[in-house]
Amino acid sequence: MKNILITGASQGIGKATAIEAAKAKMFVGINYNQNAKAADECLAEVKSAGGDGIILQCDVADSKAVISMFEQFKEKAGSIDAVFNN
């Protein structure tokens, strides 16, 4: 299984990309900054599409938070195969 981390994945293009990645059987890192409910809904749709994933809250303008987010994702997924910086 390949792993993808998507920034801004709780809505719009990021969410659509997360769902398509799930259809391709990828493990999806769903990043959001403020809308936890939308991130939860995205994860539910990822799972409905046959995939799995993790929700990662992070303000991508904060470089230390981004490093932490990548570490959390790698710990859960094992590796990072792709990043979609939305």
Name each region found by the language model.
Residues 26-41:
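Conserved glycine-rich Rossmann-like NAD(P)H-binding loop of the short-chain dehydrogenase/reductase
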Residues 53-55:
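Hydrophobic/aromatic anchor residues within beta-strands of the central parallel beta-sheet
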Residues 10-12:
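Conserved glycine-rich cofactor-binding loop
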Residues 7, 80-86:
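Rossmann-fold scaffold of SDR-type NAD(P)-dependent oxidoreductases
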Residues 36, 57-70:
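The beta1-alpha1 cofactor-binding region of Rossmann-like NAD(H)/NADP(H)-dependent oxidoreductases
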Residues 73-78:
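Glycine-rich phosphate-binding loop signature in dinucleotide/nucleotide-binding domains
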Residues 21:
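Aromatic pocket-lining residues of Rossmann-like dinucleotide-binding sites
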